[in-house]
């Protein structure tokens, strides 16, 4: 049963429990996952750990006199000190200036919670108290099963004298599910394995055990990699434009058989926005998350835009060069070579939140949040230039890519969002793939070609006159 705080006012208040109360203390609680990187969303709460009706624990938290929620800790939960995700841990340290040992992670079936304290010993004490309730009888049986399974597969590291060598071939099949190694290699490895086992009748934890074990497992792994590369580089790769004499042919072909997670997410987002997008947007591959390095380009109109092309040198026209993503190195060079910061122009770009989320890709470079790629439809045009960096989103200055995403998500219901852009003078325009600028340029060139020579001469005369005047002035 949850705590029932009193209704009357007062500085001191007590809680009535039917179950036993084990611990109570104040912690800073993490917000929902979508607001994790927002420091103002973390709140200080009073936590009370009590016995639940079952075999687990109930961790209730309160704001002043009000019960705000509870965390059920049972056999399916995990409690540990610190945060496994390095990115999240670094963000928490930056926001709260705390040590990793002052953070407690609680993972349940529905959500992950992170609690920040200011006493390492207190955090360790809480984790030590809750851990047995997370493991319970289920974890005991699981450890026993894992021990038996480990004994069947790896008899070298198990000092049990009852384990024989008859189960070794089965263990090899378990550790190597592909079963693509030749039989003579397996027998050779088994022979070395038996010889090492005979020298370790009384000392099972000596250093030779680790060396033999490492050699036994690493050898099949490297051979399997070679066999897989030979199978991948077979005749099935039709349409691959890489020459057969290329030394990295097998690596490139192996890489082309996989779909990157970024491209897969791009496809899912395209399907969800295809109802409101133009027909030409189907061939454009846009970025939703900033990542280091250039993205994959479409190799042709008949290929799947979600697959990485095997040859990135195809179709290197000027328009495709303009539509490619700007790398972190190129953006850093542009920003570091600005002669005067006062020359950077500040302007506002108004977009719908959905267009900004779907078609705009950002990346961090030289301490700025820069525009790396723009894949908007032709109706929007080419709005950005090389080196454009985000100064504010609806007059809110973001400090990271996560805050930009958070600001855009919060105004998703609004009609327009204002992006304050810093623009480098005389920078090159960043074209999109379905860009209309290239069509206008081609049309102007064709009209210029069709005109007679006499009609084209006056258009070039101003430049000629300018050069003559300069020559006369010299």
From Swiss-Prot:
Residues 449-458 have a biased composition (Basic and acidic residues). Transmembrane segments: none annotated. It comes from Mus musculus (Mouse). Residues 232-251, 272-321, 449-474 are annotated as: Disordered. Coiled coil: none annotated. This is Pleckstrin homology domain-containing family S member 1. The gene is Plekhs1. InterPro entries: PH-like_dom_sf, PH_domain, PLEKHS1. Residues 20-135 form the PH domain. It comes from the Eukaryota. The lineage of its organism: Eukaryota, Metazoa, Chordata, Craniata, Vertebrata.
């Amino acid at each position: 049963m949850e705590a029932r705080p009193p209704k009357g006012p007062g500085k001191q208040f007590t809680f009535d429990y039917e179950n036993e109360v084990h611990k109570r203390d104040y912690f800073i609680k993490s917000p929902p996952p979508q607001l994790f990187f927002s420091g103002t969303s973390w709140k200080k709460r009073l936590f009370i750990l009590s016995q639940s009706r079952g075999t687990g624990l109930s961790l209730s938290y309160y704001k002043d006199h009000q019960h705000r929620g509870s965390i059920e800790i049972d056999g399916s939960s995990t409690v540990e000190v610190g945060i496994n995700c390095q990115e999240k841990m670094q963000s928490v340290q930056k926001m709260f200036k705390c040590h990793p040992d002052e953070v407690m992670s609680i993972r349940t079936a529905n959500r992950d919670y992170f609690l920040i304290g200011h006493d390492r010993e207190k955090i360790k004490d809480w984790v030590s108290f809750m851990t047995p309730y997370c493991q319970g009888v289920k974890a005991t049986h699981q450890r026993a099963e894992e021990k038996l399974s480990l004994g069947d597969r790896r008899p070298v590291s198990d000092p049990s004298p009852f384990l024989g060598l008859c189960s070794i071939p089965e263990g090899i099949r378990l550790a190597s599910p592909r079963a693509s190694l030749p039989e003579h290699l397996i027998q050779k490895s088994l022979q070395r394995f038996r010889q090492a086992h005979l020298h370790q009748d009384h000392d099972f934890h000596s250093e030779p055990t680790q060396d033999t074990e490492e050699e036994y497992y690493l050898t099949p792994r490297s051979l399997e990699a070679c066999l897989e590369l030979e199978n991948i580089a077979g005749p099935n790769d039709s349409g691959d434009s890489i020459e057969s004499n290329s030394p990295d042919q097998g690596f490139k072909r192996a890489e082309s058989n996989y779909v990157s997670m970024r491209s897969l997410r791009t496809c899912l987002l395209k399907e969800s926005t295809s109802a409101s997008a133009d027909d030409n947007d189907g061939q454009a591959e846009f970025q939703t998350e900033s990542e280091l390095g250039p993205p994959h380009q479409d190799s042709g109109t008949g290929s799947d835009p979600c697959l990485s092309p095997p040859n990135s040198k195809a179709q290197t026209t000027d328009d495709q060069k303009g539509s490619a993503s700007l790398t972190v190195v190129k953006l850093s060079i542009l920003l570091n070579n600005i002669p005067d910061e006062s020359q950077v122009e500040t302007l506002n770009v108004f977009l719908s939140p959905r267009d900004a989320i779907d078609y705009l890709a950002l990346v961090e470079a030289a301490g700025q949040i820069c525009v790396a790629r723009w894949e908007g439809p032709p109706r929007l045009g080419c709005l950005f230039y090389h080196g454009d960096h985000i100064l504010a989103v609806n007059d809110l200055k973001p400090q990271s890519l996560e805050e930009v995403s958070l600001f855009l998500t919060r105004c998703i219901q609004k009609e327009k969002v204002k992006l304050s852009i810093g623009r480098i003078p005389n920078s090159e325009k960043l074209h999109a793939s379905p860009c209309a600028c290239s069509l206008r340029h081609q049309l102007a060139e064709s009209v210029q070609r069709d005109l007679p020579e006499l009609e084209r001469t006056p258009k070039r005369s101003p430049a000629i006159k300018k050069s003559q005047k300069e020559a006369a002035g010299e």
